[in-house]
């Protein structure tokens, strides 16, 4: 049975590297298309992979420059301001995963899906690190008969590895909002000013207090 490839947009960056590694461990024969505006970068990635092909993406074209070639799913690993990848996937009825929008940026994407909700699956992977902390916490919680509360704190060090797209995302989040969407006593509300700061206890037992200007959504 032939399987259409997954199109990875942003597959040449740091996040793309880890994504490909994870996919290969789980699905070693899964065909991949590594999409980039730079063919040389895409070919550099695919030269080290089996069942992978480099493709040049045109974000201004309705078909992303791919023509009629079959695609099984689309994953975009950077901020797609034009929503070109989502429109492409939605028009063809194939699943789409995006990971780089903030909670305040999802309305245009949801609006596209609402126009034809049964066209395809759309995953809004915008929770912290695409759910890495959430999934790990829920997995650990299964060992307990009862859980009274869960508190997750995540601190990104300025020396943590990440490509330019990651840096761009954090700078965008910090520049466009100074408030935090929080849930208190069952109600969601925007915390502003001093209330937007956050404190948590790190694994080395130190207490961290971060002002609003130093945190990301």
Regions found by a protein language model. Give the residues of each.
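Conserved glycine-rich Rossmann-like NAD(P)H-binding loop of the short-chain dehydrogenase/reductase
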Residues: 28-39
């Amino acid at each position: 049975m032939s399987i259409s490839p997954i199109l990875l947009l942003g597959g040449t960056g740091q996040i793309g590297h880890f994504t490909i590694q994870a996919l290969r461990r789980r699905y070693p024969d899964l065909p991949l298309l590594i999409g980039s505006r730079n063919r040389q970068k895409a070919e550099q990635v695919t030269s080290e992979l089996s069942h992978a092909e480099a493709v040049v993406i045109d974000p201004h074209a309705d078909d992303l420059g791919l023509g009629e070639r079959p695609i099984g799913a689309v994953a975009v690993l950077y901020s797609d301001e034009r929503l070109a990848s989502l429109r492409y996937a939605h028009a063809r009825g194939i699943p789409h995963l995006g990971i780089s929008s903030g909670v305040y940026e999802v309305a245009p994407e949801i609006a596209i899906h609402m126009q034809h909700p049964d066209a395809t699956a759309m995953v809004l992977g915008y929770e912290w690190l695409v759910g890495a902390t959430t999934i790990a916490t829920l997995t650990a919680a299964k060992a307990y008969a009862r859980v009274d509360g869960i508190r997750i704190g995540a601190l990104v060090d300025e020396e943590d590895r990440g490509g330019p797209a990651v840096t761009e995302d954090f700078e965008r989040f910090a520049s466009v909002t100074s408030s935090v969407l929080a849930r208190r006593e069952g109600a969601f509300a925007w915390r502003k000013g001093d209330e937007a700061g956050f404190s948590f206890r790190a694994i080395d037992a130190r207490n961290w207090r971060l002002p609003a200007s130093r945190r990301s959504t």
